[in-house]
């Protein structure tokens, strides 16, 4: 299997973040066992779980969308305009750097991107790109990898430069396509995202849903079958009823089945091909519709190296720090906070805490890191406003 492993992503120029975004996929801390990690080469491992936590409106979903954008380009080989419909989130110009391992080599790509108009439609294009590679034998330690990540890549040390491609290649290459496809065209892994399921949680199944999947989320379902290519042409039977539901509109299925069953079914079907190929599954607000213990099942699957043999990665955001207690490591948890200038800081939990014997959820919920929980003052001010409005109704609610 020729699967690509992302090691580091840097993005420069995203306005809501204070500094250049730096997202590590590799394990910065010592690896003592191989659960929840995948060996890439030498002492370099990648995390099978990456979590993003923080208060409401701090930038978790924005960060997840940016990660998805990069993975869709690098891993899936898609054009930038095919995968990013929130162009308003992006500045007029920005650049990103990605370090990854593929085909027994370490690669670094640095891409410069800008907005442009085509027939009054706002789009994005690549204006310059550089690619450099090195044999795996030259990077067998985290120190060497970090040196490779931090090395400035430009036209002087690049092996491939977009603007210097042969004219025939420039004619074939679309403005929205990265030159990285030259390298990664044989990659067997892929990225799938569930970003839209936060607000649009609709039932969609390709084949009959196995009872083993359905009964984890609703043990009263006897079967759920797909009868044709029509997404709403299903048959459903519950164990406690003789009635069989068939030939119903799509909205009916979303009403008769619980939101948790629908999301759980979707996540399960998304997980399987990702686990097979060592790819990436991106889930926003993973706790939506699902019991905490059900989320743990998915986390455990990605952490179990007997199931996740190819080092697939689950990347998720959450408002619930309690989920972090299911994770063995802290170098895979990104904590987002706002500074006094209302810019978002992104830091690894492992860089913020010194002790490993404290529950991760306690650290976040106690606001010990400042900015990970509502302040005492804001809570008291809110309560006082509500109390005054209930008693005196000054604002006419």
Regions found by a protein language model. Give the residues of each.
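Switch/communication elements of ASCE P-loop NTPase nucleotide-binding domains
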Residues: 1-72, 244-374
């Amino acid at each position: 299997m020729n699967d690509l492993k992302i090691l580091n992503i840097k993005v420069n120029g995203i306005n809501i973040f204070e500094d250049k975004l730096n997202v590590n996929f590799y394990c910065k801390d010592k690896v003592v066992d191989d659960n929840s990690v995948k060996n890439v080469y030498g002492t370099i491992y990648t995390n099978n779980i990456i979590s993003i936590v923080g208060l409401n409106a701090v930038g978790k979903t924005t960060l997840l969308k940016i990660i998805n954008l990069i993975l869709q380009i690098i891993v899936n080989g898609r054009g930038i305009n095919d995968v990013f419909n929130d162009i308003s989130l992006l500045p007029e110009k920005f650049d990103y750097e990605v370090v990854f391992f593929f085909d027994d080599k370490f690669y670094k790509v640095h891409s410069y991107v800008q907005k442009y108009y085509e027939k009054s439609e706002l789009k994005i294009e690549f204006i310059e790109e550089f690619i450099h590679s090195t044999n795996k034998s030259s990077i067998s330690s985290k120190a060497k990898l970090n040196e490779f990540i931090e090395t400035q890549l430009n036209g002087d040390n690049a092996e491939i430069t977009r603007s210097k491609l042969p004219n025939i290649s420039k004619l074939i290459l679309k403005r929205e396509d990265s030159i990285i496809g030259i390298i990664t065209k044989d990659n067997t892994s892929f990225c799938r995202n569930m970003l839209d399921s936060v607000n649009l949680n609709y039932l969609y199944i390709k084949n009959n849903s196995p009872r083993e999947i359905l009964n984890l989320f609703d043990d009263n379902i006897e079967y759920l079958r797909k009868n044709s290519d029509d997404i709403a042409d299903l048959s459903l039977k519950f164990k406690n009823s003789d009635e069989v539901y068939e030939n119903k509109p799509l909205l009916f299925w979303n009403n008769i089945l619980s939101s948790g069953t629908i999301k759980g079914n979707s996540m399960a079907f998304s997980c399987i091909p990702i686990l097979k190929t060592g790819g990436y599954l991106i889930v926003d607000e993973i706790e939506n519709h699902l019991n905490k213990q059900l989320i743990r099942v998915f986390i455990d699957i990605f952490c179990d190296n007997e199931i996740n043999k190819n080092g697939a990665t689950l990347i998720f955001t959450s408002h619930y720090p309690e989920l972090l207690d299911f994770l063995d490591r802290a170098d895979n948890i990104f904590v987002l906070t706002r500074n006094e200038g209302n810019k978002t800081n992104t830091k690894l939990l492992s860089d913020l805490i010194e002790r490993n014997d404290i529950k991760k959820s306690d650290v976040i919920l106690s606001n010990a890191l400042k900015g990970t929980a509502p302040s005492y003052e804001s809570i008291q001010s809110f309560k006082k406003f509500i109390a005054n409005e209930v008693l005196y109704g000054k604002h006419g609610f």
